[in-house]
Amino acid sequence: MTKTVIYPGTFDPITYGHLDIIERSAVLFPQVLVAVASNPTKKPLFELAERVRLAEESVAHLPNVQVIGFSDLLANVVKERHITAIIRGMRTTMDFEYELQLAHLNRALTDGVESLFLPSTEKWSYVSSTIVREIYLHRGDVSQFVPPPVLTALMEKNR
């Protein structure tokens, strides 16, 4: 069985920071599943189907990366798809505290599937979807933070 890792997130929108984690994961693991989450507690800039499409277009150059959308509990997706590990990007110590709690929870819910933390590269350590949305909503230039498909979608949304 091929070892597949999952990189979950809302990716609203997917950024170069996310893409960096995905590209590095694609070098380390035979199969990477990018799982775009529907989060009912958040009001997304892009609907789930659009976020999945933007993620697919952004990772098209990576043959061992697949993108799915999901609205189920992450642990259920992990078990159904026989995932080997959960990949999480880490920018700050605040991320670590939150992610560590999720890692413990996911390990319990998945019968032991581990979470692996990849630190962000310095270049992208300050980039988040939240920051990109804020800049975009205030009519700022986000071109240096998002892949071309996302920039195009944002420009079309702004018309």
Curated annotation (Swiss-Prot):
Top-level EC class: transferase
| GO MF assignments | ATP binding; pantetheine-phosphate adenylyltransferase activity
Q: Which cofactor does it need?
A: Mg(2+)
Q: Which reaction does it catalyse?
A: (R)-4'-phosphopantetheine + ATP + H(+) = 3'-dephospho-CoA + diphosphate
- Binding of ATP occurs at 10-11, 18, 89-91, 99, 124-130
Q: Where is the signal peptide?
A: none
Q: Name one GO cellular component term.
A: cytoplasm
Site entry: Transition state stabilizer:
18
Asked if Iron is a keyword of the record, the answer is no
Pfam families in the record: CTP_transf_like
Enzyme Commission no: 2.7.7.3
The UniProt entry, under CDD domains, shows: PPAT
List of residues binding substrate: 10, 42, 74, 88
Tell me which UniProt keywords the record has, alphabetically: ATP-binding, Coenzyme A biosynthesis, Cytoplasm, Magnesium, Nucleotide-binding, Nucleotidyltransferase, Transferase
Q: What InterPro entries does the database record attribute to this sequence?
A: Cyt_trans-like, PPAT, Rossmann-like_a/b/a_fold
What pathway is it annotated to? Cofactor biosynthesis; coenzyme A biosynthesis; CoA from (R)-pantothenate: step 4/5
Q: Which GO terms describe its biological process?
A: coenzyme A biosynthetic process
Recorded superkingdom: Bacteria
UniProt similarity note? Belongs to the bacterial CoaD family.
How does this polypeptide assemble, per the annotation?
Answer: Homohexamer.
Q: Which PANTHER family match?
A: PHOSPHOPANTETHEINE ADENYLYLTRANSFERASE
Query: What is this protein identified as?
Result: Phosphopantetheine adenylyltransferase
Q: Which organism is it from?
A: Mannheimia succiniciproducens (strain KCTC 0769BP / MBEL55E)
